[in-house]
Amino acid sequence: MSGSRFERELEFVQLLCNPDYLRWLTREGHFESEEFRSYLRYLEYWRSPEYSRFLTYPQCLAVLEHLNSENINDMLSDENFFLALGEQQYFIWLNKHKEGWNK
């Protein structure tokens, strides 16, 4: 793996915004692994301002919050979760150039 631990974790936490990647993680059984679930909890440090300022896609923190919730298995078994996430991402990317779009 190339890059520092910081760079790898920055890239990974932002990949959580990608519904296709989340589908793949689900199909591969990663969310059934306690080690993986612990890693997701560890990534909560990205919420602190000293780290979150580096995020290009800060909405990944909302996804991370969902992934660390008790009912995540129910959410991941529902295709509507992935569809809604994809629609939200599209809307964010579509409107990001507009001043004050997220206020």
From Swiss-Prot:
Q: Which InterPro entries does the entry mention?
A: Med31_sf, Mediator_Med31
* Family of the protein in this entry: Belongs to the Mediator complex subunit 31 family.
Any Gene Ontology biological process:
regulation of DNA-templated transcription
**Protein name per UniProt:** Mediator of RNA polymerase II transcription subunit 31
**Which proteins does it associate with, and in what oligomeric form?**
Component of the Mediator complex.
Pfam families to which the protein is assigned, alphabetical: Med31
Q: Is this entry keyworded Cell membrane? A: no
The protein's UniProt keywords, in alphabetical order, are: Activator, Nucleus, Transcription, Transcription regulation
Subcellular localization, per the record?
Answer: Nucleus
Q: Which GO terms describe its molecular function?
A: transcription coregulator activity
Known role: Component of the Mediator complex, a coactivator involved in the regulated transcription of nearly all RNA polymerase II-dependent genes. Mediator functions as a bridge to convey information from gene-specific regulatory proteins to the basal RNA polymerase II transcription machinery. Mediator is recruited to promoters by direct interactions with regulatory proteins and serves as a scaffold for the assembly of a functional preinitiation complex with RNA polymerase II and the general transcription factors.
Name the encoding gene, please: SOH1
Q: Name one GO cellular component term.
A: mediator complex
